[in-house]
C-alpha cells in the first residue's frame, strides 16, 4: 500500500493511478478519430475499480461496465476477515508495520481517499457491474458498497455460483450495453 505511511494523502500510489486514468481518458477523448460523446470504460477486478474511478473523475464518460471491482470498502473487508486475494496486502501491512494496530483508525481513514465507494456518487455514466456471489478475492459486500452509492442509471448482473472468474454470458451483456454508443 504504497504511500500509506506518507503524511500527505496526495502521495498514495492509487491516487496517482486514478489520476493517470483521467489523463488517459482525456487524451483519448481529445483525439480526432474519437467521438468524445461515445466513450466507455471497461474492466475487471483492479481494472474494474480503476474504470469506476475514471468514470467518476471524467463525467463525460457515457458507460462504465465492470466486473468484481476492487479498491472498495477496505474497512469492512478487514472487519469481516475477508483479507485474502486482492485485500491480502492489508493483513501484510498490519503485520509488518503496525502489529498492535495502534494506527488502525488512521490507516483506514487514509485508505478512504482511494476507496472507490467514496467516488461512486460522482459517476454520471450508465453503469453495469457483474458480481460473483462466491467471490473470495473481492468480497461481494465491497462491490455492493460501491453499487449502492452510484446515483446514475445502473444495473447489476449477479452470478450466485461464481467466484472471481469469468462470468458466463456477462461479456454479451456488456456488448449489448456498449451497442448503445454506436
Please identify what each model-predicted range represents:
Residues 153-175:
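Histidine-bearing beta->alpha loop at or near hydrolase active sites
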Residues 133-138, 164-165:
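Acidic catalytic loop of the alpha/beta-hydrolase fold
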Residues 33-45:
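Alpha/beta-hydrolase fold nucleophile elbow
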Residues 123, 129-131, 135:
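Short beta-strand/loop motif that positions the catalytic acidic residue
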Residues 125, 139-148:
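Short alpha-helix in the alpha/beta-hydrolase fold that links the catalytic acid
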Residues 29, 42, 48-59, 64, ...:
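Short glycine-enriched nucleophile-adjacent loop
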Residues 1-19:
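Cap/lid segment of the alpha/beta-hydrolase catalytic domain
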Residues 53-101, 158, 166-169:
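Hydrolase active-site cap/lid region
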Amino acid at each position: 500500500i504504497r504511500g500509506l505511511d506518507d503524511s500527505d494523502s496526495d502521495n498514495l500510489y492509487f491516487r496517482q493511478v486514478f489520476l493517470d486514468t483521467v489523463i488517459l481518458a482525456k487524451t483519448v477523448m481529445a483525439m480526432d478519430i474519437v467521438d468524445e460523446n461515445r466513450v466507455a470504460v471497461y474492466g475487471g477486478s483492479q481494472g474494474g475499480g480503476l474504470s469506476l474511478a475514471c468514470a467518476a473523475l471524467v463525467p463525460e464518460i457515457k458507460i462504465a461496465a465492470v466486473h468484481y471491482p476492487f479498491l472498495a470498502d477496505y474497512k469492512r473487508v478487514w472487519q469481516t476477515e475477508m483479507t485474502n486475494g486482492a485485500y491480502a496486502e492489508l493483513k501484510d501491512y498490519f503485520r509488518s508495520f503496525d502489529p498492535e494496530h495502534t494506527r488502525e483508525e488512521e490507516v483506514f481513514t487514509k485508505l478512504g481517499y482511494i476507496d472507490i465507494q467514496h467516488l461512486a456518487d460522482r459517476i454520471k455514466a450508465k453503469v453495469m457491474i457483474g458480481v460473483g456471489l462466491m467471490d473470495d478475492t473481492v468480497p461481494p459486500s465491497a462491490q455492493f458498497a460501491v453499487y449502492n452509492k452510484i446515483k446514475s442509471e445502473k444495473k447489476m448482473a449477479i452470478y450466485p455460483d461464481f467466484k472471481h472468474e469469468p462470468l458466463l454470458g456477462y461479456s454479451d451483456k456488456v456488448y449489448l450495453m456498449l451497442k448503445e454508443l454506436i
